[in-house]
């Protein structure tokens, strides 16, 4: 898809902060009734004066540093003028020619190769309110407006147009989200935490912007549809109109909203009620506070715990998962811990649509380590461990109580040997078949032992014992 050119504008809400960008209204509005976390400032009342939230600026500087961007010596806020119902002042306080940071990059892994996605700028702005529609944006007869979100601190991270496929765009977004969560300035599980405007053109044709896509899967689908739509137009000898489009998630298509605005349409000018922000002192405050970033953690986990890169690169995808692994690895063999967390526990959480943050509450690392310790000591089978994990996640309870209730403690080896002998004695035909070279007969004999033990024997160990007895 070398003829496809994609650039993204990613709007990130700094939702781990306590208050909004220019007022003291609390940010924890997501479960609140509409229009209850508002004040004259975020409602744009005449005479209300904004005051910059220093913690928001520090968080923004931290993000810019982690993205390898160049922090500017001073930064200025501007008024971006346009009329829309979710913008009560009639303008948005944003940044134009003096953004917080310029340049930077995010490294992704694409088809086994590293690629740097170059950034154009990182700037701060306030979030508008939230519009809701009965039905869809294209069919609704009226809009409802909730201003609880109005004035929330946003970072806009703008890439250069250097991506060539929807897959590449999604990989970039996944990596960006990971970095933001490591910095603890952002909770990606909250609604509206990350919204994307995707710009796409083909072979130098008209650039189309797809506005306000709320999920990474949606970005990939919207871009895929738009590539198909634009190529179809070009193949028929028609031109691609420069416009703004909306992604209809129900139909997986994009629909036209309006002609594309030019920058001059917004009539930017400096915000007269806010002084320029000098960043040198803030940079000094933030320097040294950056946490270990994903790639650094990946290398350390391999070095410190002796695990393979195949496990390390998965563990770092979620900082809570990596931290969970480290707690478990203090108590059991790290390689065993990595294997069970990556291959089993992660899958069970995904099946339930749970995050590792929730896992910390429901299935504490020391409990998981205790279960793996039983497995190491051959006190429970692999199948039994999986059953305990599922029961613990679904019903709760103590590990020992679950194992006792379900009868999952492994049978002593002496008893398994006794059951193997019984299976051999009771099934002479299967023994004869096995000795004549029919390997499936061994599976039958193992199955008989599993019946006798009600699944508490390890199938691989049982097969090995039977083979030794019949050799």
Curated annotation (Swiss-Prot):
UniProt KW Ubl conjugation keyword: no
InterPro entries xref list: Asn/Gln-tRNA_amidoTrfase_suB/E, Asn/Gln-tRNA_Trfase_suB/E_cat, Asn/Gln_amidotransferase, Asn/Gln_tRNA_amidoTrase-B-like, GatB, GatB_C_1, GatB_Yqey_C_2, Gln-tRNA_amidoTrfase_suB_CS
Entry protein name: Aspartyl/glutamyl-tRNA(Asn/Gln) amidotransferase subunit B
MF terms in GO: asparaginyl-tRNA synthase (glutamine-hydrolyzing) activity; ATP binding; glutaminyl-tRNA synthase (glutamine-hydrolyzing) activity
Source superkingdom: Archaea
Native organism: Archaeoglobus fulgidus (strain ATCC 49558 / DSM 4304 / JCM 9628 / NBRC 100126 / VC-16)
Protein purpose: Allows the formation of correctly charged Asn-tRNA(Asn) or Gln-tRNA(Gln) through the transamidation of misacylated Asp-tRNA(Asn) or Glu-tRNA(Gln) in organisms which lack either or both of asparaginyl-tRNA or glutaminyl-tRNA synthetases. The reaction takes place in the presence of glutamine and ATP through an activated phospho-Asp-tRNA(Asn) or phospho-Glu-tRNA(Gln).
Self-association and partners: Heterotrimer of A, B and C subunits.
EC number(s) stated in the UniProt entry for this protein: 6.3.5.-
Listed GO biological process terms: glutaminyl-tRNAGln biosynthesis via transamidation; translation
Record keywords, A-Z: ATP-binding, Ligase, Nucleotide-binding, Protein biosynthesis
Keyword Transmembrane helix in record: no
Reaction it catalyzes: L-glutamyl-tRNA(Gln) + L-glutamine + ATP + H2O = L-glutaminyl-tRNA(Gln) + L-glutamate + ADP + phosphate + H(+); L-aspartyl-tRNA(Asn) + L-glutamine + ATP + H2O = L-asparaginyl-tRNA(Asn) + L-glutamate + ADP + phosphate + 2 H(+)
EC class name: ligase
């Amino acid at each position: 898809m070398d003829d496809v050119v994609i650039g993204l504008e990613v709007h990130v809400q700094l939702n781990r902060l306590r208050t909004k960008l220019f007022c003291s209204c609390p940010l924890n509005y997501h479960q609140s009734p509409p229009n209850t976390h508002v004040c004259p400032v975020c409602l744009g009342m005449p005479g209300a004066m904004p005051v910059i939230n220093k913690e928001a600026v520090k968080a923004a500087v931290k993000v810019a540093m982690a993205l390898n961007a160049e922090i500017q010596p001073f930064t200025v806020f501007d008024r971006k003028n346009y009329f829309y119902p979710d913008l009560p002042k009639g303008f948005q306080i944003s940044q134009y020619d003096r953004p917080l940071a310029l340049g930077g990059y995010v490294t992704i892994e694409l088809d086994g190769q590293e690629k740097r996605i170059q950034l154009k700028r990182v700037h701060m702005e306030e979030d508008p309110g939230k519009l809701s529609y009965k039905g869809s944006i294209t069919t609704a007869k009226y809009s409802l407006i909730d201003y609880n979100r109005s004035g929330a601190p946003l970072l806009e991270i703008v890439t250069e147009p250097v991506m060539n496929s929807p897959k590449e765009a999604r990989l970039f977004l996944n990596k960006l989200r990971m970095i933001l969560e490591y910095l603890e300035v952002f909770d990606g599980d909250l609604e509206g935490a990350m919204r994307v405007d995707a710009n796409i053109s083909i072979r130098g044709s008209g650039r189309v912007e797809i506005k306000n896509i709320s999920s990474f899967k949606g970005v990939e689908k919207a871009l895929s549809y738009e590539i198909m739509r634009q190529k179809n137009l070009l193949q028929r000898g028609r031109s691609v109109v420069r416009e703004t489009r909306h992604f209809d998630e129900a139909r997986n298509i994009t629909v036209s909203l309006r002609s594309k605005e030019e920058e001059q349409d917004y009539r930017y000018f400096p915000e007269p009620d806010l002084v320029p922000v000098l960043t040198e002192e803030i940079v000094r405050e933030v320097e040294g506070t950056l946490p270990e970033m994903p790639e650094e953690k990946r290398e350390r986990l391999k070095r410190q715990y002796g695990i393979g890169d195949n496990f390390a690169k998965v563990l770092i995808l979620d900082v809570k998962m990596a931290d969970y692994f480290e707690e478990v690895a203090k108590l059991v063999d790290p390689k065993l811990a990595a294997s069970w967390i990556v291959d089993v526990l992660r899958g069970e959480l995904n099946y339930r649509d749970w995050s590792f943050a929730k896992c910390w509450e429901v299935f504490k690392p020391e409990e998981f380590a205790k279960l793996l310790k039983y497995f190491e000591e051959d006190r429970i089978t692999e199948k039994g461990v999986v059953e305990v994990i599922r029961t613990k996640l679904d019903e709760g309870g103590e590990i020992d109580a679950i194992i006792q209730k379900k009868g999952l403690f492994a049978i002593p080896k002496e008893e398994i040997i006794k059951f193997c002998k019984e299976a051999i004695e009771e099934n002479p035909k299967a023994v004869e078949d096995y000795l004549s070279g029919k390997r499936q007969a061994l599976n039958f004999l193992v199955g008989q032992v599993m019946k006798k033990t009600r699944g508490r024997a390890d199938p691989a160990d049982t097969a090995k014992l039977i083979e030794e007895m019949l050799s």
